[in-house]
Regions:
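Membrane-proximal basic amphipathic "stem/tether" segments
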Residues: 1-38
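Active-site and donor-binding regions of nucleotide-sugar-utilizing enzymes
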Residues: 30-121
């Protein structure tokens, strides 16, 4: 019970901090974040969208959001890749800069458990 309360307080504090940071960090229209299958797999429509953008839209920077499990595969297939490990502090700050976010399941499952979506499309 105490562990659950601690986790809830931690998650709420993180969300509030990210919300406050979102007012100071400007979204960049050339940044695109893509996630799929909770970050566990580099598959599905998100994969093809990411590869298409990297190949055909050199003006955009693609960030793939995933777990450590998918990092190696993303490095091999997505060039130039920018991998963000889901729910890490550095990933959430980088996500605050992304103007566009694409996901296959739900935003809080594929991209981040924290609220990094204010003013994102």
């Amino acid at each position: 019970m105490l562990k659950e309360i601690t986790e809830t307080i931690k998650r709420l504090s993180g969300s509030i901090l990210l919300l406050l940071l979102s007012f100071a960090i400007r979204r960049r229209k050339e940044y695109v974040a893509i996630g799929s299958w909770g970050g566990e797999n580099y598959i599905d429509n998100g994969r093809y969208l990411a590869e298409y953008i990297c190949k055909n839209r050199k003006d955009l920077k693609v960030f793939w959001v995933g777990t450590k499990k998918t990092r190696d595969e993303v490095e091999k297939k997505l060039s130039p890749y920018r991998f963000l490990e889901k729910d890490t502090v550095s990933a959430n700050i980088a996500l605050l800069k992304c103007r566009y976010m694409f996901f296959s399941q739900m935003h809080n499952y594929d991209i981040s458990s924290y609220n990094v979506y204010r003013k994102a499309t």
